[in-house]
Structures are given as structure tokens and as C-alpha cells.
Amino acid sequence: MPEMAGWTGFYVGVNAGGGFGTAKNDFSIAGAPSFATVDLPQKGAIGGGQIGYNWQAGPAVFGIEADLQASSIKGSVSTPPLPLSANYSQELPWFGTARGRIGYAQAGWLLYATGGYAYGRVKTVASATAGPATVSVTTNENGNGWTVGGGAEVMIAPRWNIKVEYLYVDLGTTTISYAFPALPALNNNTHVTINVARAGLNFRF
């Protein structure tokens, strides 16, 4: 391997990968206790970019990083028409993180742990069909929570490195209210958690 510079400096990069997880949904009517819980499995592809800064002191590396991801992570469930059918789907169109990093560098490699703030958009589509009539409601809510994970990077040229990374992302609980004609309001507390695995390429300034 050719001689490489250290890890100190700003960098930008791109990444791609996938994610899977669960959206836990608790349903209640007009503030009453929850009457049903639905755990909705979700999975899909992700892709995006990151920007960050590293500071190296001996083998120790400290850093900050922010990323933003486009996502196709989603899940859905349907009930048979007996005589009312219902369809419920949730997706994560985008999400991002802002994290601290701490790692150990040796011979062009960097192993690190990371954690911090996570945020994202949770899109929900709920519909009910009875005979010829269908009622559908679409909501978009912003989730806020935390993330933790780790990864490895290796220098492939003086200013370039590749990376692999795992993150556990918890977007917290958001509350959705559905208003269907001639029916009491339905409240839905949804808690989204996902596991993210991705690979990336960084350019260091």
C-alpha cells in the first residue's frame, strides 16, 4: 500500500445500501386506551451523501459527520373484505443523521463507533373500503430520535477512502390523527426503528 496521509481534515462522500426494521403502531379512539397494536415490517434501499470532519491524535481519531438519505424503505398490510377491507402502509422517503465519531487508526485503516441525532419523514396511507365506497387518508410526519452504530474505513489513495457502516436508527414516536366521515377520530402512535447497512466513498480535502 502506498504511503497515506493522516485522517485529519474535511471530507465529502456518497453512499448506498439498504435498511430494514419495524413500525410499531398503537391505535386508539378519542383518547381512549389503545385497542390494537400492529408491528409493520419494513425494508428497502437507501442512497445519499455525507459530509464531515476528522481530527487525528496519534492512533485516535475524533470526528463529526452529517448525512442525508433518500429511501425506499416501506411496509404495508391489508385485511380481507369481510365486508370491510382496510389497507395500511408506511414508508420512509428520506432520513438523516448528525453524529459524533471516535475511532482507532492503523496502517491506512480506521475502525470507529458513532452515535447522535436522527430525523426523517414518515409517510402513512390508510384506507378503508366497504362496498363501492373507499375512504383514504395520507399523512406526512417528521420523526426525531437517535442513532448508534459503527464502521470501518480504508484509504485507497492519498485523498480517497472507502467505508462500510451499520447504524441503528430510532425515529421516536409520532402521533397521527385520522378523520373519517361519520366515524370517531382515530389516533395512531407510530414508532419507527430501522437497521441500516451501507457502503460509501469519501474524498478528503
Give the residues covered by each predicted segment.
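Gram-negative outer-membrane beta-barrel domains
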Residues: 1-205
